[in-house]
Design a protein with these regions (language model features):
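A noncatalytic interaction/capping subdomain that flanks phosphate/NTP-handling catalytic cores
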Residues: 1-82, 92-102, 106, 112-222
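Hydrophobic positions on the alpha1 helix immediately C-terminal to the Walker A/P-loop
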Residues: 89
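Conserved lysine of the Walker
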Residues: 86
Length: 222
């Protein structure tokens, strides 16, 4: 994790805006992980993410299970259950758009989201899933797109009720921790008021990218 965190290193004194977080692992925590069959690297990853998550919630942010892609300065979040193809679909955007647009993957698995007065912003972080793709950058969120596999491509906007039922399960918090749950729910209320949510049924094709681009940016695929 130290290597993954290197791009985010900063010189700062401890303060409410720059709190110190103890990410150290105790011997008992290492042993518990070993007994579960986790590798030392996985134990470290899970422990540090849990501590990071706790702190970002207190700072008015939350982590979301998605591949966050920055396209010409705006972020689109591709979300789905693990194994559906978030990373694969994001890779199609890099393949088919990078020659004409600036395409950057902010985080391939757990972007940090903050609801601000000027909109919702997505941030990169070192905790980025098995592909370890992340960038120390931020972008305003243009849309959230939930993916499901299908032989043909189609997309539709979802109702507010549907949006909540899709988004909440993909947020990260200790669901048995009442305070964490309340913090996430409060932020989601504002998040869903500001960000459109779509459901994309798609295959692995250039046409799927074109459909989403045209829908979100309301323009021709160029």
């Amino acid at each position: 994790m130290l290597r993954q965190c290197a791009p985010y290193a900063a010189q700062a004194d401890a303060s409410p805006n720059h709190p110190w977080i103890d990410l150290g692992l105790s011997q008992n925590q290492r042993e518990e992980g070993r007994q579960r069959g986790d590798s030392p690297a996985m134990v470290e990853y899970n422990h540090t993410f849990a501590r990071f998550l706790q702190e970002v919630l207190e700072q008015g942010c939350f982590c979301f299970h998605a591949s966050a892609l920055q396209v010409d300065g705006e972020a689109v979040l591709f979300s789905a259950d693990s194994g559906t193809g978030k990373s694969t679909h994001a890779g199609l955007w890099e393949k088919y758009l990078a020659d004409r647009h600036r395409v950057v993957r902010l985080n391939d698995d757990k972007p940090v989201l903050r609801v601000r007065q000027d909109g919702v912003w997505a941030y990169g972080s070192p905790w980025s899933g098995k592909h370890v793709i992340h960038t120390n950058a931020k972008a305003p969120v243009k849309a959230v797109v939930f993916l499901e596999q299908a032989p043909e491509n189609r997309i539709r906007s979802v109702t507010s009720q549907e949006a909540f039922s899709l988004v909440f399960p993909q947020t990260f918090c200790l669901k048995t921790d009442a305070r964490q749950r309340i913090l996430v729910l409060q932020m989601l209320d504002q998040f869903l008021r500001q960000v459109p949510v779509y459901l994309l049924s798609c295959n692995i094709s250039r046409e799927a990218v074109e459909l989403v681009y045209q829908t979100i940016w309301k323009g021709d695929y160029k």
